[in-house]
Amino acid sequence: VYKRQSLSALLAAPGGGLWDIGAGSGAIGLEWLRARPEGQVFAIEPHGERRGFMDKNARRFGLGHDERDRFTVSGAHAPDAFDAAAFSPDAVFVGGGLSREGLLEGAWQALNSGGVLVANAVTLEGQAVLSTWRERVHGDFTTLSVSRGEAVGRFTGVRPLIPVLQWVGRKP
């Protein structure tokens, strides 16, 4: 739902290398490749079912087998997966796993100078991690909120989705 806002912030980064942590369906990484044809993505997703969605979405996005080397996937947990990356990132997206020990620190250390890190949190625990992180490296917070129309009897009501706290930081 908040893919556009996240991609907009990520695409402000120079270069073409993205780490997508907690990649889920792979949408952020695949859209990154669409916007950066020379780019590459290292997607980290420990849940097998979600990695299956990623493969289906890669085909749907038209990412052929000859291009799959630009979209590599690790089934390990972050930050343990970081050592398997073939490149240092110009941009990092954290869509899940914020409360894992060392995740933000490791991603920030790996991030190239001038690079952008975007982290989205929907839980209070994730938001607490981002609040503490912001005290260390600054950056900007945005709360993203969307409501959708749905039937309420014969009328239409508006139901809010879970809001997302987004933190964006650029590494000096």
Locations of the language-model features?
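Conserved class I S-adenosyl-L-methionine
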Residues: 15-24
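Conserved SAM-binding loop of SAM-dependent methyltransferases across substrates and taxa
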Residues: 25-37
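Active-site segment flanking the S-adenosylmethionine/decSAM binding pocket
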Residues: 72-118
